[in-house]
């Protein structure tokens, strides 16, 4: 039986030199890489937290999904990841395609398989991250803080 996605996850931020937040990458991996390089991001000492919506609109959505597998990346689930998961699960692609999911259709078969595998892993992304750092507690969500 599959375990449901944790709604809330905690991160011990004190183990990282710097914690960087990035919202709505939307498939623009090279732009993110340039910014991280500019900030002297060190994947062995720093943490990148994505605030969701790593896919759609930009040219590198598959690579952005694969970024989530890196040891130095954590993420909360955004509405674009949820749209993609729902579209594939229920074979109803229209809403996702209207919101930038056309990159998936343009992929070769083997890349679509990779994207599906990566999107399945997104089911385990929390909706809320709580980071405890030297400066206190920080709560990260994509858009709305769930009131339940």
Q: What feature does the model see in each segment?
A:
Residues 2, 12, 18-22, 27-96:
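Core catalytic region of metal-dependent phosphoesterases/phosphodiesterases
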Residues 6:
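Carbohydrate-interacting/catalytic domains
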Residues 13-19, 131-138:
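Beta-strand-turn-beta hairpins that frame and shape the catalytic cleft
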Residues 137-148:
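Divalent-metal (often Zn2+) His-rich catalytic cores of metallo-beta-lactamase-fold enzymes
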């Amino acid at each position: 039986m599959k375990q449901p996605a944790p709604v809330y996850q905690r991160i011990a931020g004190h183990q990282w030199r710097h914690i960087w937040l990035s919202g709505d990458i939307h498939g623009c991996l090279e732009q993110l890489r340039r910014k991280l390089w500019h900030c002297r991001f060190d994947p062995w000492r720093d943490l990148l937290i994505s605030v969701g919506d790593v896919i759609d609109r930009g040219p590198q959505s598959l690579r952005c999904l694969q970024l989530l597998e890196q040891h130095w990346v954590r993420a909360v689930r955004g509405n674009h990841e949820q749209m993609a998961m729902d579209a594939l699960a229920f074979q109803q692609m229209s809403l996702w395609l209207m919101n930038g999911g056309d990159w998936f259709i343009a992929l070769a078969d083997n890349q679509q398989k990779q994207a599906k595998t990566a999107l399945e892993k997104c089911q385990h992304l929390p909706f809320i991250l709580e980071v405890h750092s030297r400066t206190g507690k920080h709560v990260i969500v994509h858009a709305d803080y769930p009131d339940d």
